[in-house]
């Protein structure tokens, strides 16, 4: 999987084709790899490589970590501010604990810490460390009973990004959003909260149905 993610991007740049050539063998694919069609992040790296002229491996291993690792810490900081308000000591302790857990979280190749520090260019690494926490943060902003409708727009874009970074994002992001909608609707008893929640869940429903129909 580590090779295939970058291999797909390199193959697309060299052949000018998307999901038509097997990056392992160079043979033409007889059917679309559905898991990758619904997680087109390697194609985005290929696009950036095509536009900039920088090799996809350099983009993935050097430039992407420079963006998304600080972004992960930024989301954690914003969550800490949401929890502790202006209490700087508590926020600082939260961030120190977060950094320690990330630095010493390599107890398995499947932990979020491993994905963050070793292969953040993969969609599921971004999903676990950036987009799912971001959905929690933006969902808390957009689904409160006194929130404005325009505050749903960032949450909607975050939902679209979650769906595009990994096929698991459609499932996990949809479950997270559904739970947030249920919690905030039950606490507020307002139909407007339910309507906003349904709106931001639309990408998950559409892509989930499309995936099931194509697999059938």
Language-model regions: role of each:
Residues 151-167:
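Membrane-interface alpha helices of multi-pass inner-membrane proteins
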Residues 69, 128-136, 172, 176:
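Hydrophobic core segments of transmembrane alpha-helices in multi-pass, intramembrane catalytic enzymes
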Residues 1-103, 109-121, 126, 130:
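Active-site lumenal/periplasmic loops and adjacent helix-entry segments of GT-C-fold
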């Amino acid at each position: 999987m580590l090779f295939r993610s970058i291999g797909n991007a390199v193959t697309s740049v060299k052949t000018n084709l998307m999901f038509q050539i097997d990056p392992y063998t160079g043979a033409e694919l007889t059917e679309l790899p559905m898991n990758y069609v619904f997680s087109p992040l390697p194609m985005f790296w290929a696009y950036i490589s095509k536009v900039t002229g920088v090799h996809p491996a350099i983009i993935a291993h050097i430039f992407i970590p420079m963006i998304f690792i600080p972004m992960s810490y930024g989301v954690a900081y914003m969550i800490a501010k949401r929890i502790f308000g202006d209490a700087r000591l508590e926020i600082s302790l939260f961030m120190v604990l977060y950094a320690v857990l990330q630095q010493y979280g390599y107890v398995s190749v499947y932990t979020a810490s491993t994905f963050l520090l070793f292969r953040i260019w993969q969609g599921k690494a971004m999903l676990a460390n950036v987009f799912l926490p971001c959905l929690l943060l933006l969902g808390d902003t957009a689904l409160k009973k006194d929130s404005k409708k325009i505050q749903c727009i960032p949450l909607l874009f975050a939902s679209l990004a979650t769906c595009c970074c990994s096929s698991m994002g459609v499932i996990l992001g949809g479950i997270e959003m559904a739970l947030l909608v249920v919690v905030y609707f039950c606490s507020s008893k307002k139909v407007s909260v339910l309507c906003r929640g349904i709106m931001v869940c639309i990408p998950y429903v559409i892509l989930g149905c499309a995936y099931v129909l194509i697999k059938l």
